[in-house]
Amino acid sequence: MTEDFLDIHAHFVYGVDDGARSEEQMRAMLDAASENGVTTLFATSHAAPGLERFPQETYARHLESARDYCRAKGYELTLYPGAELLYNPMLRDAARESGLPTLADTDWVLMEYLPQTSAKELETGLEQVAGCGYSILVAHVERYRCLEQRGLLEKLKARYPIACQMNCSTVLEPGGFWQKRRVERWLRKGVIDVIASDTHNTTSRPVKLREAYEKLKADFGEETADRLTGRAGPWKAFRETL
C-alpha cells in the first residue's frame, strides 16, 4: 500500500550541489523515496541567488532524467522543481531583478539560514522575501540557535506568511535534553507544519519518511502524522493545486 507522503525538501538531482553525485546515486535515492511511500517529491537543490550562479540547465536536464527513470520503473512518484535558497543580503535584490526559484512555480520558496544566524537576521530575511510577494517555508527550523528563545518562532509565524519544516532525522533523533523538549513542544503545539527528508544520499542522509511517520503517529497521533506528511491538512491542499 502506498502511504502517499509528500517530501518537500530533497537533494536527489545529481551534479548540482552536495546531494546525489551521480545518476546512479540519484536513481537509488528515487528508489528509496518510492519504497518509503513518497508520491510527491520536490527537487530542492541548494541555491544562493545574488551570490552565485545556479546551474539551471544541468538541473533541468537531470530532473527530466529523474522523471524518465520514475516513468520507466512505474513509480507513483511525481517530481516537482524547487530550490533550497540560502538567505543572504543580496537575496532581495535577486528577487526583485529576476525572481526566485519557487516550489513548483507557486509563490512558495524553501529558504534556509546558517545555523548561527541571529534572530534579527532571520526576521530581516523573512521580511525582505515576504515583501517581494513570496510565502516562505523555513527549512529545518530546529537548526537555528536563535529559535531556542521560547516563543520566538510562534511570533514570527504570526507576523509573516511562513510555514516551518522539520527534518525526519530530527523527529527520530531530536538530540540532547533541551533540544528534545523544544522539538516535542513545537510538534505538540502545531508549530511545525511539515516534515521532510532533506535527503542527500542513501547512507548518511537517507529518506526515512515512513519511519518518521510511524514515530509521529505513535507519539502524537495519526491526525498529526498525516498533517505533517502532507496526507491531510494544508499541505495536502497545496499538493492538490499542483
Question: Where are the regions that the model predicts?
Answer:
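Extended substrate/RNA-proximal surfaces in nucleic-acid metabolism proteins
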Residues: 52-165
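Mid-to-C-terminal alpha-helical segments outside catalytic/metal-binding sites
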Residues: 209-242
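Active-site mouth loops of central-metabolism enzymes
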Residues: 12-23, 109-117, 171
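An N-terminally biased module of ancient metal coordination in phosphate/nucleic-acid-related enzymes
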Residues: 1-75
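Short acidic/histidine-rich active-site segments
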Residues: 46, 191-207
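Non-catalytic positions within long, well-ordered alpha-helices that form the structural scaffold/packing
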Residues: 34, 130, 187-188
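Active-site neighborhood of phospho(di)ester-bond hydrolases with catalytic His/Asp-centered motifs
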Residues: 6-8, 42-44, 80-83, 137-139, ...
